[in-house]
Amino acid sequence: MASDSSFPGASSNVAEYSVSEISGALKRTVEDTFGHVRVRGEISGYRGPHSSGHAYFALKDDRARLEAVIWRGSMSRLRFRPEEGMEVIATGKLTTYPGSSKYQIVIEQMEPAGAGALMALLEERKQRLAAEGLFDPALKQLLPFMPRVIGVVTSPTGAVIRDIIHRISDRYPLRVIVWPVRVQGDTCGPEVATAVNGFNTLPDDGPIPRPDVLIVARGGGSLEDLWGFNDEIVVRAVAASHIPVISAVGHETDWTLIDLAADMRAPTPTGAAEMAVPVKADLQASLASQSARLSSAMSRFFDQKRQAHRAAARAMPSADQLLALPRRRFDEAASRLTRALFVNTQKKRVHFDGHARQLSPRLLQRRLVELERGVTMLGQRLPRALEAFLRERRTAFTHRANRLSPEPILRRTRLTGSTLEQLDRRRDQAVRLLIERVKRRSQELDRLMRTLSYESVLERGFAVVFDAQGKPVKQAAAVSPGDALSVRFRDGDVGVVARAGLTIPDPTKGQ
């Protein structure tokens, strides 16, 4: 390479590098000098893994910033999920990126910078979610007493699921549906939230039944191991669940945010199974005890009612005592009824005799003769009256015809002739109707006369007694011993001689 002696220092022995050479030299120097380093800093700009699985962010403190990258393989081995603002200790190699003259750390391992940092982050998240009401006790749901299906969100290969299934089988065997998830690592939180939401979206009548209660379980571990159950998406999913949730994460001394959002917290996964289902043997014993108590109570109840019935029966008067007064009243009413019937019959007979005297056959016959005579007279007078009327009208027509022209007279004559024909027809019809009415009335009177006649009484099996003069005998007092009497029956008369009078017994006496 040519040198220009006009510039100062041009003849020195300083090596000359291209940009690529100096960048490569810097890269080798940094990597050789800082092989493995541990860097403490706060995560900044973290947006989660890229679609490739790698994660890009920065570590910073109050004076500097260091770009960082975690390749997919290392990302999957992390024991916790990185979050924005979390203070961590990253272990890895420093390197440079020649394309932009930047240096960065390629992280191979990363852990939270002590429990204090995680606890501070956890407390801040707890306060924020509590302010939203996600931990409100009023939102807690009651666990069903006897669930049919239990959903378990846990690892399918750990001892936790075996303990839960074994405990449920011992207490109250029922159907258990397991939704397998990772219970540690970067994907723990999203998988648990997906499982809780997935159980809630199951239809009641689908091929996979919808659980009546959920158990989210994991064994014990450090704060970093349990960090996935502090994830905000897990807390929101559990708080929004329409299915009651039991959290059983870690040991009794461990606590996570899911414990605050769940409807019930169990100290262990086995304890969660005990909370979820009752003991079948206890239920059977309780049922037997309740049945025995019910039988005993029913027996006592029936004994009390039986004793009360006996006491009431002893205090109740006998049937004869209860019926004595009504029976006496009935007997008195029966005795009065016979007399009342007799008196009423006598009154009705007197009333009937009065009407019968008013409607004697001779009176009816006389009335019938009068009606027939009236009808005959009307029949005789009507033709003469009509004839006189016609003669009068003809005379009037004749006088008028002499004074009027022929045409009007002819018209009026024709009209009058038509009127006369109508009058003739109406006369004939009126005479027929009158005669029919008189005949019907005569027939009715004749039937009434036959009905009221003593002969109809004879037809019904009675007899009429006549004295020697042929007059009917109406009272026994009018007959003396030795009088000759005639008894008329339906088919003839029989002569008899009266003996001493007999006293008619009073039907009301001797009752």
From Swiss-Prot:
It catalyses: Exonucleolytic cleavage in either 5'- to 3'- or 3'- to 5'-direction to yield nucleoside 5'-phosphates. Coiled coil: none annotated. InterPro entries: Exonuc_VII_L, Exonuc_VII_lsu_C, OB-fold_nuc-bd_dom. GO terms for biological process: DNA catabolic process. It is found in: Cytoplasm. Transmembrane segments: none annotated. The keyword Nuclease applies. It holds the Pfam family tRNA_anti_2. Its EC number is 3.1.11.6. Keywords: Cytoplasm, Exonuclease, Hydrolase, Nuclease. The keyword Transcription does not apply. GO terms for molecular function: exodeoxyribonuclease VII activity; nucleic acid binding. One of its GO terms (cellular component) is exodeoxyribonuclease VII complex. Its main location: cytoplasm. Heterooligomer composed of large and small subunits. Bidirectionally degrades single-stranded DNA into large acid-insoluble oligonucleotides, which are then degraded further into small acid-soluble oligonucleotides. Belongs to the XseA family. This is Exodeoxyribonuclease 7 large subunit.
